[in-house]
Design a protein with these regions (language model features):
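Single-stranded RNA-binding regions, centering on S1/OB-family and related RNA-binding modules
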Residues: 1-197
Length: 197
């Protein structure tokens, strides 16, 4: 078959990458990589003008993984997609184009899986300290991902000292510890400044 021929010429790193992609596609296992850019994919339609789908691009080695923006967030955030470049994201593969050497993924499915696990297995509660990964940072607000939730916080949740511009301290991809202030089925409130208290 054509795929067997394609797979025969793979290096060990390439084979490992494809095996991880196939495993995620077949068993819904999570993969994690860094957002390296944005790509606009034309969608053929009968209407004029042509429709375009914007995707986040992640790549571990050679295979381009596209995460369409509608499948990136569970709830709309209004965050500029460019500010997410550099963030580490979890995702689940939902489509594979072996010959085109690319795959389609959904971060939203990974978030739902992580959220369910945090609420029903870990039973996160007020006062717990959890890992949080910075998704995007602006001058006065920061969005982190923790336990399957995207949480946006102002400066008062980050530090007891005033920060004129939070981008001087925080950046996409940075790993933080955060204290759970409250948690529910559809919400998580965090504080980075209160981790030690």
């Amino acid at each position: 078959t054509a795929f067997a021929e394609l797979d025969r010429n793979l290096s060990d790193d390439e084979r490992e990458e494809w095996n991880a992609i196939y495993a995620s596609f077949s068993s819904r296992s999570l993969l994690r990589n860094t957002v390296i850019g944005l790509e606009s994919i034309p969608i053929p339609t009968d209407d004029e003008p042509e429709q375009v789908l914007t995707c986040m691009v992640v790549m571990r080695y050679l295979v381009k993984v596209l995460i369409p923006l509608p499948l990136f967030w569970i709830e709309p955030t209004g965050i500029n997609p460019n500010s997410v470049i550099g963030a580490d994201v979890d995702y689940i593969i939902i489509g594979v184009d072996r010959e085109g050497e690319c795959a389609i993924a959904a971060r939203s499915l990974a978030l739902e899986q992580q959220r369910w696990h945090a609420l029903n297995v870990q039973h996160i509660a007020e006062g717990d300290v959890v890992s949080a990964s910075v998704m995007a940072c602006g001058p006065t607000r920061i969005t982190v991902t923790a336990c399957g939730f995207d949480v946006t916080m102002g400066q008062q949740a980050m530090s007891y000292t005033y920060l004129a511009d939070m981008r001087e301290e925080y950046h996409a991809g940075q790993q933080l510890q955060a204290k759970v202030l409250s948690v529910g089925e559809d919400m998580l409130a965090l504080s980075v400044r209160d981790v030690g208290t």
